[in-house]
Amino acid sequence: MTDLTSKERSRLKGIAMNLDPIFQLGKESLTPEFTKAIDEALEKRELIKINVLKNCDGDKNALAETLAERTHAKVVQVIGRKIVLFRYQKDPKKRKIEL
């Protein structure tokens, strides 16, 4: 997947505004199980929001980049304690979001 353009990123941010976080990143940080769960959620939903808890150690931007790298996703936005990730579904017929 190529980098997102500013127009694509803007559209995804608009969609993400109405999403509730479906994961919470806490003290345990980026475990293999957490990464696998994120990967599975991205396959089903394409766009997800993650809540970073106060007890989570580390820089939110670095965590977002690491998570995106491990799941082959793109970081749409890191704002406050929220991370938004995007990845197209592998099957083009099942894609829900077209950019």
Q: What is the role of each PLM region?
A:
Residues M1-L99:
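Positively charged, polar, low-complexity stretches
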